[in-house]
């Protein structure tokens, strides 16, 4: 298995990307890497080139670049060349910590969608804090599509089910629809239509509507939503977690000697909470619905997160989930067409 890597994307690129790839190379002996970046900057950072091939990419798509325009114009950028390697069969998956929009655009325009999938969904893994039998759940779409139709969300449920089964190893994943209440008639017309469609799909273990306050309590294994709501929810969850940790730390520091003594006794608890909320252990966000895995991590990614994300990509490749999705949508093309028409009505 070979992974095409954008070495120039991210706040700490190329240093932390290269370190992370070398950690991943040592951790996963079955993997090889095509590292795309500016040779003059990347070459001096490589300590050991075993199973790592550096490919010169003289152009860089910056975080502030307009995504689609940059992908179309910067043909020699690390993002475009890495995605092209996947399209041409030189690599099996694409990894980047760079410009999110450009990574998504490269995935769509260069690698391409699985036939039958109208819009790929960006999928992320989040922690579950209140269930001993469940450590995490996946949510999609978290930002690939700001304008999403009900039919797209129904397809997200199918894609999320396959991801949970093949990568997270959940036998019969519970699928929930993010909504403003748990009752079946909650939400606008679009959400009610999505709810009814999912409830009538025998192959989906649909548990109904899920409220955002119950996400981290393990209300479902897969939560589906439109890209705008999903992205806002993801940022709210991450921001709230960081704010709470800062609040607790501030109260401890202002509590004098007694507060500091109490904090020292609770250190193991704080460490567990911080670890549970640390996104780096869950890898990156996967653009589900493409012909090959495309995985995007936070721009602030460092070496350990890179390594963990590569492990996630290895699971994706080993599961052949893209092939499974392709087979499903090919075999159910008539049902999908009928469902799309029903949801338009």
Swiss-Prot record:
Organism: Levilactobacillus brevis (strain ATCC 367 / BCRC 12310 / CIP 105137 / JCM 1170 / LMG 11437 / NCIMB 947 / NCTC 947)
First-tier enzyme category under EC: transferase
Keyword Nucleotide-binding: no
GN (gene name): plsX
GO molecular function, one term: phosphate:acyl-[acyl carrier protein] acyltransferase activity
Compartment list: Cytoplasm
Main location: cytoplasm
Keyword line: Cytoplasm, Lipid biosynthesis, Lipid metabolism, Phospholipid biosynthesis, Phospholipid metabolism, Transferase
InterPro entries named in the record: FA_synthesis, Phospholipid_synth_PlsX-like
A Gene Ontology BP annotation from the UniProt entry: fatty acid biosynthetic process
Similarity annotation: Belongs to the PlsX family.
Role played: Catalyzes the reversible formation of acyl-phosphate (acyl-PO(4)) from acyl-[acyl-carrier-protein] (acyl-ACP). This enzyme utilizes acyl-ACP as fatty acyl donor, but not acyl-CoA.
One Pfam family recorded for the sequence: FA_synthesis
Pathway assigned to this chain's UniProt record: Lipid metabolism; phospholipid metabolism
Reactions catalysed: a fatty acyl-[ACP] + phosphate = an acyl phosphate + holo-[ACP]
Membrane spanning residue stretches: none
Enzyme nomenclature, EC number: 2.3.1.274
GO cellular component: cytoplasm
Disulphide linkage map: none
Subunit structure, as described in the record: Homodimer. Probably interacts with PlsY.
Protein known as: Phosphate acyltransferase
Keyword match Nucleus: no
């Amino acid at each position: 298995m070979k992974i095409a890597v954008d070495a120039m994307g991210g706040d700490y690129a190329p240093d932390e990307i290269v370190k992370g790839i070398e950690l991943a190379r040592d951790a996963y002996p079955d993997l090889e890497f095509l590292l795309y970046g500016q040779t003059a900057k990347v070459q001096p950072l490589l300590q050991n080139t075993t199973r790592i091939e550096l490919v010169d990419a003289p152009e860089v798509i910056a975080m502030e670049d307009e995504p689609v325009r940059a992908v179309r114009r910067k043909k020699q950028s690390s993002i475009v060349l890495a995605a092209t390697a996947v399209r041409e069969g030189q690599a099996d998956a694409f990894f980047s910590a760079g410009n999110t929009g450009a990574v998504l655009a490269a995935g769509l325009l260069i690698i391409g969608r699985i036939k039958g999938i109208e819009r790929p969904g960006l999928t992320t893994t989040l922690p579950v804090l209140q269930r001993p039998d469940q450590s995490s759940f996946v949510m999609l779409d978290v930002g690939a599509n700001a304008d999403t139709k009900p039919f797209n969300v129904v397809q997200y449920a199918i894609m999320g089910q396959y991801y949970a089964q093949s990568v997270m190893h959940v036998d019969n994943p519970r699928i929930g629809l993010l909504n403003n209440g748990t009752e079946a008639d909650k939400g606008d017309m679009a959400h009610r239509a999505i709810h009814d469609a999912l409830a009538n799909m025998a192959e989906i273990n649909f548990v109904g509507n899920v409220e955002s306050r119950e996400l981290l309590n393990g209300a479902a294994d897969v939560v589906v939503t439109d890209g705008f709501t999903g992205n806002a929810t993801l940022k709210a969850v991450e921001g709230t977690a960081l704010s709470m940790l800062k609040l607790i730390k501030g109260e401890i520091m202002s509590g004098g000697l007694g507060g500091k003594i109490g904090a020292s006794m609770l250190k193991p608890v704080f460490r567990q909470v911080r670890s549970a909320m640390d996104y780096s252990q869950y890898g990156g966000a996967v653009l589900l619905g493409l012909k090959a895995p495309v995985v995007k991590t936070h721009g602030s990614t460092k070496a350990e997160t890179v390594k963990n994300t590569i492990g996630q990509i290895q699971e994706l490749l080993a599961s052949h989930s893209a092939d499974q999705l392709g087979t499903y949508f090919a075999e159910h093309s008539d049902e999908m067409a009928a469902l799309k028409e029903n949801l338009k009505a």
